[in-house]
Amino acid sequence: VKRALVCAASCLLAVLVLVQPGSAAEPRLVGGVAADQPHAFTAALQTTQGEFFCGGSLVNPSWVVTAAHCVEGRAATSFTVRVGSNDRTQGGELVTPDRLVTHPDYTDTGTGGDIALVHFPAPVQAAPVPLGTATAVGTPVRLLGWGQTCPTPGCGTSPNVLQQLDTQLVDATKCTAPINASVELCTDNPGGNAGACYGDSGGPEVSQVDGHWVLLGVTSRPGNNSSTCATAPSIYTSAVAYAGWINQQLAPPPPPTPTPTPTPTP
C-alpha cells in the first residue's frame, strides 16, 4: 500500500506537518526554515475541530489543488481550508468547501492520479498561483508546508508558521519506490536528510519564473517507501502534467440548452 505523507492519528495528537522535515531549534520542514515571504496561495486543510492534516495550493479564487489521498473518504463539508496566511491558525480566510473532485486515475495502491480539487462556494481574496509549464531535471524548486519537522511518525508538532525548503527536481530513477515518471516528479532530499514529512501531503512544490512563483507539483509520498521522512528523494504529482485536467474542472459549466418554445397551433 502506498504510504502517503498525510497526517495520521498519531501525527494529529502531536500536531502535523508537510514534506520530509529536519531538526532545528525552530519547527520547520525537515531541514527547512520559516517562509521568508508571504505565500497567500498556500492552503491549510484542517478538520472542523481544527486539526491540521494536509496542505494545498490555491489555483483559482474558487479552487484549491491538493493530493487525492488527502480528501479520500472525506465529505467536502467535513473540513475547512485556510488561505491567504502563512500562519495556519489565524489570518487570511477560512472556508468550508462545497465540492471535491478527485482524479479518476487515483488508487491508494498505484502510481499517478494522486491529485484532487477542492471547490469553494464563493471566490476568496487571496491571489492564486499559476500552473507551471516545464519540469526539467535540475529545475530549482521550493517546498512549502506546515508538516512535521522531525522525521519519524508522530515525533513532533506541526509549526503554526509556514515552512520552506529549497531543493531541485532529480531524475525519476533517484526515487526507488514505484513512480510514474510521465505524471510524477522525483525531488531531491538535500544533504540526504531534508524534505517533506507527515502533514505536508497535498502542499505546493513551486518554482520561480521571471520572478513569479508557479506551481509544478503536489506533495504525494516518499520516494523509498520508508516510514522515516527525508531519507531519500520524494515523489510529487506533476501539476504540469495534469494541467489539462485541472483547467477542465476549473472551466465554468456550459449554459443549459434552452428548451424550444412550441409553435402555437393555428
Enumerate the predicted regions with their spans.
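Disulfide-rich extracellular modules and peptides
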Residues: 72, 152, 157, 177, ...
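Active-site region of chymotrypsin-like
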Residues: 37-52, 123-128, 163-203, 209-233
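C-terminal subregion of chymotrypsin/trypsin-like serine protease catalytic domains
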Residues: 3, 58-71, 80, 164, ...
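Subtilisin-like serine protease catalytic core
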Residues: 76, 136-138, 156-157, 208-217
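Protease-domain processing segments flanking chymotrypsin-fold serine proteases, especially trypsin-like
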Residues: 1-65, 73-74, 78-85, 159-160, ...
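Chymotrypsin/trypsin-fold serine protease catalytic domain
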Residues: 87, 94-95, 100, 112-192, ...
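Short, solvent-exposed loop/turn segments that connect beta-strands within catalytic domains
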Residues: 50, 88-91, 108-110, 154-155, ...
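Active-site-proximal beta-strand/loop segments in catalytic clefts of secreted hydrolases
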Residues: 45-48, 58-61, 67-70, 83-86, ...
